[in-house]
Amino acid sequence: RAVKRLSAITLLLLGFFDPCLADKPNILFIAVDDLRPELNSYGATHIQSPNIDRLAAQGVQFNNAHVQQAICMASRASLLTGYRPEYHNIYSGESVGDLLPNALTINKHFERNGYQLAAYGKIYHYKSDHVAQFGGRWSDGSTELFDNGRYATQDSLDKLELNRRDPVRPHEDRGPAYESADVEDGAYSDGYNTARAIETLRQFKLSNEPFFLAVGFRKPHLPFNAPEKYWEMYPPGSIKPAEIREAPRFSNQYTLRDPGELRNYYGMPKHKGESVDLETELTLRRGYYACVSYVDALVGKLLDELDSLGLAENTVVILWGDHGYKLGDYDNWNKWTNLSIDTRVPLIVRAPGLEGGLQSDALVELVDIYPTLADLSGLEIPQHVQGTSFVPLLRKPDLEWKKMIFTLWPHYRDKFDQTVTGFSVKTEKYNYVEWTRLATGEVLATELYDAVDDPAETINVVSLPGNDEAVSEMKILLEAGWQKAIPIVR
């Protein structure tokens, strides 16, 4: 032992030994479904999110983080495998296990490097992927809970049964679009899973091995179900409707998708083109906000437990949303576009030894998370990973970084149809989209939004006078691809 210690000291003096790598940090990996960057720390003062705000005050908040594709499984597939959509070929209902059975996912990479694994809730999309990735170390809800922690009242289950027999749009598994129930946090699966995750943290504390604990919150995804006390944080009279009511001017047939997701729920408009009334819109928005505050409280419980166990000082905490969401914006209730309201997400990282309370406006992508966490942990970044570690931004948030980032969206018609896909390149100034017929390469439509002068993306200016040069430049960037966006760190 004395020889080993002397060797370490000698290496340290010679500059070859990094003591930080001798004690790998733990990872608390927090995924939140359908979470918009509509949090107090992001400037949304109407939202009560004190615990996520606390995390931001202790870490680095990214204000310009975007997903690769604005739908649950495809977005998560890029983050968890390190592959971009064009390479993993997951666009909607496919699973990682079906298309990438041998992929070295982020959790597998950490496991191979000596990390203990555990996961609760929604990390991937399908149960089969969770079981394949985590085995018996994953769980989601419990049969001990009413309705397995989805709905909390019999009234909601009665409405679910009515919805199964709806004459216009029946759905086997959708009840009301929202629920306010006088129950404890643990009555819903998110609260139950948080309690289980806390138990696991206590078990991990007894071990000398680092851990990778993934906690995936299903809220604020539809249905907007949360304990009543979180609804009460938002009095009905305080809720405002969406500011942008119409589709972007000069948009095309591919820009938006009909809001079929909301129509699946009981009591919601069932016909295409039918909008929700104002009262329903305000109730839905209130329910979404309640769910955000519910998840925020659960995040707070996890952070508090890290503190009480003495684990916070050696744990990387990362919180991310898998895509944005339209709460009546553009008269839509879904994600599923290349518009920034759907691709932009909250991303916050707190890492040991790094300054907190910082914000970065740099362009980053969720595919960058895999290499970043590997980098922070002193692990090799696998060669297949197509993202870029943004650890330099954690140290210097205003560092010159990526000039552009990339998203895509395969167009839906009556059923999923990949023959026409919208490829988007985003810079600090513009969001440019080309809708391309994949079989021929023909560009059918284009869009250009000015992110500086029109951050809500209300006008497609691609054909307006004075934008020819911008269109040409953005087209070149799109064709150059993500490899040309890798920053050079000096």
Spans of features found by a protein language model:
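Residues forming the ATP-binding cleft of Hanks-type serine/threonine protein kinase domains
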Residues: 452
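Sec-dependent N-terminal signal peptides
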Residues: 6-16
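N-terminal secretory signal peptides that target proteins for export/translocation
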Residues: 1-3
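Formylglycine-dependent sulfatase
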Residues: 21-435, 440-444, 455-486, 490
